[in-house]
């Protein structure tokens, strides 16, 4: 870790230790969902997951293999990983095969990550929410394994990643989480549960972590049906795959897009099937 990395981590830890005890632990606002202490705990959770991946990246990323590069990328940010590898393919088209595998593995880790997030913030609903999400995650695992079997490229150094403990990134996530949980509660109160699917469609382009945490918390508080909760999380995850495929095309190459889209297409089809057919 560089001196700047250490400073960023220490700054975030110190600020969190100072801020958390003084933040009010009560909800306020029109829909009583904006709890300052809870919002900052969500920031700490997401930064902690990303930081674990970032520290591992600093320790092993220089010579990371394909699987490790994908796992670390998914822990830090699967979207940022997609952007980084798409840009690398733009400079070196021959890296398309390697980049596609890493992007799909990172997205698979992101699929598992939402289950962990639900377990962390709303364990009471995990038994009802996890099965369809686990089923979809296993499909993503299958796609990752399939791509690994057909790709013999060795991994190389991972692109430089942003430290998730940077205060700016943490504050942005906190703001996005607060906005999404407020929008979700407002949509539910004014328009009913069906409106949450529209929130999921938009959130998938912005931040899957935020919609996952906010929906899980609302479901645990019995303000959102548990079935609606996992459907919203899955829809946001599927939209995020569409977004990453678009990134692969616009920032990378047609070859990268085709490779990524072949895996994501199966995953999206499977996800839609789960949405429609899950009992």
Role assignments for model-derived ranges:
Residues 112-116, 130, 224-279:
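C-terminal transmembrane helix pair
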Residues 1, 52-61, 82-92, 145-157, ...:
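C-terminal ends of transmembrane helices
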Residues 12-23, 43-51, 136-145, 173-182, ...:
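Hydrophobic core segments of alpha-helical transmembrane domains in multi-pass membrane transport
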Residues 75-77, 83-93, 101-111, 119-123, ...:
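Membrane-interfacial helix-loop connectors
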Residues 30-49, 127-136, 168-176, 254-269:
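Entry/N-cap segments of selected transmembrane alpha helices
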Residues 16-28, 112-120, 178-186, 213-220, ...:
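Hydrophobic alpha-helical transmembrane segments in multi-pass integral membrane proteins
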